[in-house]
């Protein structure tokens, strides 16, 4: 009877879920992919998916991106204006407060929109995920258009509150600061966006989600914190772009030649940084292109 009981137990289905199903320790010399072999990599998204165009969820996601980017520009540009108008920086939140405004808004907005659109709120993030085949080209283009429109509207509302103050504060537009070259600015944007998009890939990694059930709920936190840290580092250099929609919206509403000086940096830099992050995570760390379905 004892032997039969042990046999029955050995044949029982493993009903453990979440982190309890995987061993805590990883033997030296083994790859992380050896853990949790029941995981299957999601299939790559098609470049064009016609069925999306007839789905309400597709348009709803774009609306969510528009509203999120609108709110992002509204709060962050207002914060920049509040700091700029004060004669004494000691009486304002300063650079740290500006960084918290950007990072905090990304944290809140990603949390709110992740279940609807994925919570991109940034063409560079969308571009990186497109390169990783996480979404279709159709959806990526739609997202970028809605993000840019939301950014323009958000900055426009801020300017409507006080045009003179908005103009004197530079409209929150990005520009390379005196003492730095365009190469410095481009490098800062590339590295800053790499940090952000790499964090996005790591925080939303489907394999980690399969292993640790708490990962999706915590994803907005490291993403927002990455934005905060990058702003602390690069506000003195470029005002921190790392988001082409944010840079475009502020430049259009500011409507000043200064806002367009070196504007290409805030598109080329973020897109290059996003591409590097996608390659690093998907090819170097996960080696997805070199795997076959038989390995999962």
Swiss-Prot record:
Statement: the UniProt record of this protein carries the keyword Heme: no
Motif NPA 1: where in chain:
122-124
Membrane topology according to the record: Multi-pass membrane protein
Which protein is depicted?
Aquaporin PIP1-6
Give the species: Zea mays (Maize)
Q: Name one GO biological process term.
A: protein homotetramerization
* Family per record: Belongs to the MIP/aquaporin (TC 1.A.8) family. PIP (TC 1.A.8.11) subfamily.
User: Membrane-spanning residues where?
Assistant: 63-83, 98-120, 141-161, 183-203, 217-237, 265-285
Q: Where located?
A: Cell membrane
KW Secreted (keyword) present: no
Question: Motif span (NPA 2)?
Answer: 243-245
**Gene assigned in the entry:** PIP1-6
**One GO MF term attached to the UniProt entry:** water channel activity
Cited NCBIfam families: MIP
Q: Kindly list the GO CC terms recorded for this protein.
A: cytosol; membrane; plasma membrane; protein-containing complex
Indicate where this protein is primarily found.
Answer: membrane
């Amino acid at each position: 009877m004892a032997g039969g009981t042990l046999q029955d137990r050995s044949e029982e289905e493993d009903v453990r879920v979440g982190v309890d199903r995987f061993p805590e320790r990883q033997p030296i010399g083994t790859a992380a992919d050896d853990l949790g072999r029941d995981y299957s990599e999601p299939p790559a998204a098609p470049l064009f998916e016609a069925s999306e165009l007839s789905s309400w969820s597709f348009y709803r996601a774009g609306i969510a991106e528009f509203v999120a980017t609108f709110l992002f520009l509204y709060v962050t540009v207002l914060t920049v204006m509040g700091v700029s108008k004060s004669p004494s920086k000691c009486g304002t939140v300063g650079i740290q407060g500006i960084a918290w405004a950007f990072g905090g808004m990304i944290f809140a907005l990603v949390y709110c929109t992740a279940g609807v659109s994925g919570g991109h709120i940034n063409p560079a993030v969308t571009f990186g995920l497109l390169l990783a085949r996480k979404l279709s080209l159709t959806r990526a283009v739609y997202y970028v258009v809605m993000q840019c429109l939301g950014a323009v509207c958000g900055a426009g509302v801020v300017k409507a509150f006080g045009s003179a103050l908005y103009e004197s504060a530079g409209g929150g537009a990005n520009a390379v600061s005196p003492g730095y070259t365009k190469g410095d600015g481009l490098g800062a944007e590339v590295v800053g966006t790499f940090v952000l998009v790499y964090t996005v890939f790591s925080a939303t990694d489907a394999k980690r989600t399969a292993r640790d059930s708490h990962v999706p709920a915590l994803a907005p936190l490291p993403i927002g914190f990455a934005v905060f840290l990058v702003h602390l580092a690069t506000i003195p250099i470029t005002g921190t772009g790392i988001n082409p929609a944010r840079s475009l919206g502020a430049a259009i509403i500011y409507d000043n030649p200064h806002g367009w000086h070196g504007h290409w940096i805030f598109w080329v830099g973020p897109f290059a940084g996003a591409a590097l992050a996608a390659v690093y995570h998907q090819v170097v760390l996960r080696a997805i292109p070199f795997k076959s379905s038989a390995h999962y």
